A protein has these predicted regions:
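A conserved ligand/cofactor-binding region detector
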Residues: 1-545
Length: 545
């Protein structure tokens, strides 16, 4: 089911000192400085390479990482199983004093999760209290093959069945179309946006590639393979694995077992409960039981979905701005909450506006976020967007977000660039074939497995319930120039609805880094800044060497 990356004997000898295995898609990072782990994961998200190959090619033999010196000391140590036994003994003593949950919050692990479908990545990234870096579709062309096939998963439910050949053939055709159109988009953008003299070649080419990848990504199916780097505490991993055990997808359940195996090399005692029948297994059964009951209840709803806009503001507090003023004054007043609310209601509008401006302050950039008083204000948005945009917005975890199953039922988006290169016919044909494949899979294996066939261009319904402080972060970040045009449009509309539908003019206007402008080469400025940072880093390194 998984491609095994080839390494030489010498490479495996190096890798075995820093990773818990050299031949499986899930592995933990060991014996590395924390800064190296972070840098490795950061590079990982923009590279087509596996983490182990990236480590060998770009990190291992660089003296500034200190990796080679660590490798020499590790080579002389006792075997890993003995070190784990010693750690277990220590953890047992600590647990007896402080309890499992308290200690499990303080120990963590870096885990690489490779060859994950884009259904699995959403399950991995569900938990709030963890850090994730996922391979981006905007910096990598998915037109290369591993071991003779494109980078997609044939789910265990389908592999070896009579539908497997049809499934694989349709996937190959879809990726053939993607490969053709992503290169055609790149050539089109090169003609449309020729390199200007003041822009370096690498910056221009990176911007062109990002725009082409953005335009063509709608053809990538949910079965597309990705890599995810995770850093989480033992407690967060436990919650993740227990939730994954309850999944209806065999890929997710198989991955759970692989993750548990690797994590037990590095934080074994934190994960003792996961596969114990009376503890983690019972917990997983609770999740699956509730899901089964709700599926049954949901199937009896007779209503058909109404026609709605791409973004709807469905709930907000009409008194939000008054409550915000009361909360802003709470920490500096010495007055009880209800008394402050009464005072805020009596304030003239001009005075409330003055207090709010003082509380927001003079923001020099979007990272200067105002305080927690904004967390008293909330907004609930119902969104019907392409799955590709959902993948980006779903990464925001300081809010409540739930989604429905991915299906072809809500139609799909056609990017302007596809029309411009005269490829709309191929786009429609490819997506139509995948809708037919979805129906076959749905009939044979049910709607959960059928999701693998649905490309990113198809629309998915989800809600996002957030407080105003998180709205500052999300809307200002996701409308910035370098963002994908589709999710920029969604977040621009959220901002407009806060101001115009909710009538929260003061709050919306305080989000002064929300960008409603439109751009051509969205990544150009960001790539310029990246190049400048690389140059400064190289100069600093040359001065110290």
């Amino acid at each position: 089911m998984y491609f095994t990356e080839p390494f030489s004997d010498a490479e495996r000898a190096v890798l075995s000192r820093f990773f818990t295995n050299t031949d499986r898609p899930v592995f933990a990072l060991i014996n590395m400085p924390e800064v190296v782990k972070g840098a490795l994961f950061a590079r990982y998200s923009r590279s087509p390479k596996s983490l182990r190959r990236l480590f060998l090619d770009e990190f291992y033999d660089r003296p500034e990482t200190g990796i080679e010196a660590i490798a020499e000391s590790v080579a002389g140590e006792d075997n890993p199983s003995l070190r784990i036994q010693r750690a277990e003994s220590l953890y047992e003593r600590v647990f007896s004093e402080y309890g499992d949950d308290s200690v499990a919050q303080l120990g963590g692990a870096h885990l690489a999760c490779e060859q994950s479908s884009n259904l699995l990545t959403k399950v991995l990234e569900w938990g709030r209290l963890a850090a994730y870096l996922e391979q981006s579709t905007r910096y990598i062309y998915y037109d290369q093959k591993d071991d003779g096939r494109y980078r997609y998963l044939t789910p265990p439910e389908i592999a070896g069945t009579t539908l497997a050949a049809d499934y694989n053939a349709e996937m190959e055709m879809l990726f053939d179309t993607y490969s053709k159109l992503v290169r055609a988009c790149a050539a089109h953008f090169e003609r449309k946006y020729p390199k200007e003299p003041e822009v370096s070649g690498p910056v221009w080419r990176s911007s062109i590639r990002a725009k082409a990848c953005d335009a063509a990504r709608g053809l990538l199916p949910a079965a597309t393979l990705s890599n995810v780097g995770i850093f989480a505490t033992g407690q967060a991993y436990e919650a993740m694995l227990i939730r994954m055990q309850a999944s209806p997808l065999e890929e997710v359940r198989q991955y759970t077992r692989m993750m548990l195996q690797e994590l037990r090399y590095v934080i074994p005692a934190f994960l003792r409960r996961v596969d114990i029948e009376a503890r983690g297994i019972a917990w997983s059964k609770y999740f699956s039981g509730v899901q089964s009951q709700m599926e049954d209840t949901g199937s009896r709803l007779a209503a058909q979905p109404a026609e709605v806009a791409e973004v709807s503001l469905t709930e907000w507090d009409p008194d939000a701005e008054v409550k915000l003023i009361a909360s802003a004054l709470y920490a500096v007043s010495g007055l009880p909450d209800d008394q402050l609310l009464a005072l805020a209601k009596k304030m003239p509008a001009a005075e409330r506006e003055k207090v709010l401006k003082q509380y927001v302050g003079d923001r020099k950039n979007r990272r200067h976020r105002p305080g927690r008083a904004f967390e008293r204000v909330f907004y609930r948005f119902d969104v019907l967007s392409d799955f590709g945009s959902f993948r980006d917005l779903q990464r925001h975890r300081m809010l409540t977000l739930e989604w429905q199953r991915l299906t072809p039922d809500h139609g799909y988006n056609v990017p302007d660039a596809i029309e411009e290169i005269g490829a709309s016919g191929e786009w429609h044909a490819a997506l139509g074939r995948m809708a037919e494949l979805y129906q076959k899979l749905n009939s044979a294996y049910g709607p959960d497995v059928a999701q693998y066939a649905v490309p990113f261009a198809y629309r998915l319904r989800y809600y996002m319930h957030m407080n105003a402080r998180e709205a500052f972060h999300l809307l200002e970040l996701r409308t910035s120039r370098q963002g994908h045009a589709d999710y920029r449009r969604i977040c621009q509309e959220m901002h407009r609805l806060i101001r115009e539908k909710a009538g929260h003019r003061l709050i919306a206007d305080a989000m002064n880094y929300v960008d409603h402008n439109e751009y051509d080469l969205e990544r150009l400025d960001a790539e310029r800044r990246s190049e400048e940072r690389r140059h400064r880093g190289a100069q600093a390194q040359s001065r110290t060497s």
